[in-house]
Amino acid sequence: VRHTATYIPPVAARSFAYLGVTAHEALATGNPALQSLAGQLTDLKPLPARGSGDFDEPCVIHAALAAMVETLFSNTGPTGQRAMVKMSEIMGRTASAGIAEDVVNRSVAHGQAVAAHVLAWAAADGGAKIDNMGFPQEYT
């Protein structure tokens, strides 16, 4: 956030809220004890269901959050960009260590689908486009 232009507190809070929703939904699709937020949060439609086969939860959540961070913080400076890439590589490698390749691929694809769904939902909230460096056009 520190290196991301336009990230005043409301903009940062919005991004962190969407990261939380994404993390919850990524796990809720594979855990019947967790209730999806679809239908509870305004206009959030049911998320993509998991297909058949095994999934690895760390790989699912890593892929979902990595996709969200890449999009939500895309306008960060060079230092932030390098940090995001490095962290994603380390976390991806750690999450997938010892997991069968087909399970990793299926899990990553599902995590990315969850992120895409949440990002599409977020695009309609009125806060996706940041003008005037994140400050209101008219300020009194």
PLM features per residue range, with description:
Residues 1-140:
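Acidic/polar surface patches and capping/hinge elements
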